[in-house]
Amino acid sequence: MTSSSPAGAPYDPDAQVHLGVFYTGVGPQLIWTDPDAPPHVAIETFVHVARLLERGLFDAFFLGEGLRVRENRGRVYDLDVAGRPDAITQLSALAAVTDRIGLVATQNTTYNFPADLARRLASLDLLSGGRAGWNIVTTDNAWTGANFRHGGWLPHERRYERATQFVEAAKELWASWEPDAIAGSGEATSWARPGAIRDVERDTGLVRLRARATVPASAQGRPVLFQAGDSSGGRELAARHADVVFSANTEYDKAVAYAADLRARLAGHGRSPDSLRILPGAAVILGDTPEEARERAEWVHEEQISPPRAIAFLEQYWGTDLSAYDPHGPLPGIEPSETELDPSRGTIPIERRTGKLALIAQWREQAAAENLSILQLVRRVTPRQRSFVGTPSQVADEWVRYVRTRAVDGFNITPHQVPSSLEDIVDKLVPELQERGAYRTEYTGTTLREHLDLPAPISL
């Protein structure tokens, strides 16, 4: 992944690379079939990874969260790791066995409730000594909602409206304790000073509550807020409330444009450019030589698309069971169905069906021209994970350029093998960054906010 910096781009020779790891626990990126891979739902695995990242002086360990198990043909999609423990519960366990690494939980604003989630996150923040973060996400999928009392209750276009109201309620709850609310021992007659804890009452349309926060502020004031949406609504939510953005814009030119857009939005909300960190998601594939790195990247791509996954991929486009087809044989000759395999989607709209028919026709033409099997075609047409591929020195040079020209502030790494791909980064890439003066050689703070060099929350 290479490109030149634009002429006249800002340059900060002292900018530091911030690093997190986004451990989804599920999804095609993770090669769980690796014979050396540990159990991906075992607490021992998460403890090992968290301690490894702390040894590598990472800012944060970032856990994904899902409120619905993925399905295919009406059954659990078991070609990936199919389940995962609750993120806050996992991170609470990790808080007890780590000292510095930030602990970021993905939590949904569509199907949670502000007072309850604010309390759970504040508890993690307090018990970890100010190391908690919240990755704010929304859900518009009615099938996910079917797991909840309010299944399908919120139209797609209003999810960010509720998210904004939800975050504002959580921030008000976190700010409702005065810094010295807890009375000192000695002559105090009550545990908390009278009037030092304010009630919070809100009715903003999509969020209604009357509550009192039960957890005092942590050493960092409140959890660090992450936001991952790339739509206009997501960017606006980030500009108003986020401390960190987890973006999908890894290509340099797109990263520059994305950063410029976000910083312009920050100004519109009276925020400084330094009040937000941008950490795009990326994979890292290292080799001792460029050729070795490229060969490994090809191996990773092939492992991520196994023969059963290739069949499952086509089933999403044909809308029917294709398990009888040989992944090493030709594409199915049958026409696609008018229904989706995902029961939440029902019948395919005519525009979507027309697009699928055109795409399938294109695939058939390509497969015939190049004599490709199902597996070969799917590997060819599936977009590769956004990756930095090269020697540790090459990747370090790229990252320094990205960060010091303010395209990004660092990266949130999605590992393809656990723990080996992360061990390579800690043991080979981190020292290269340190040699360039672009990465810490020790933690200088104790909280996640300090690791990210973020200002204190305005509300405190």
Where are these regions (language model features)?
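Active-site mouth loops of central-metabolism enzymes
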Residues: 29-44, 106-115, 151-153, 157, ...
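Substrate-recognition/cap regions that form aromatic- and gly/pro-loop-enriched pockets
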Residues: 351-431
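N-terminal beta1-alpha1-beta2 module of alpha/beta enzyme domains
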Residues: 2-97, 220-223, 446, 458-460
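Conserved, mostly hydrophobic/aromatic
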Residues: 19, 53, 57, 94, ...
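C-terminal helical cap(s) of enzyme catalytic domains, especially alpha/beta-barrels
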Residues: 148-151, 155, 166-171, 256-264, ...
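Hydrophobic faces of well-ordered beta-strands that scaffold small-molecule active sites
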Residues: 17-21, 61-63, 101-107, 130-136, ...
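Internal, glycine-rich beta/alpha segment that forms the wall or movable "lid"
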Residues: 6, 11-17, 113-236, 240-241, ...
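Short, conserved secondary-structure transition motifs
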Residues: 278-292, 449-460
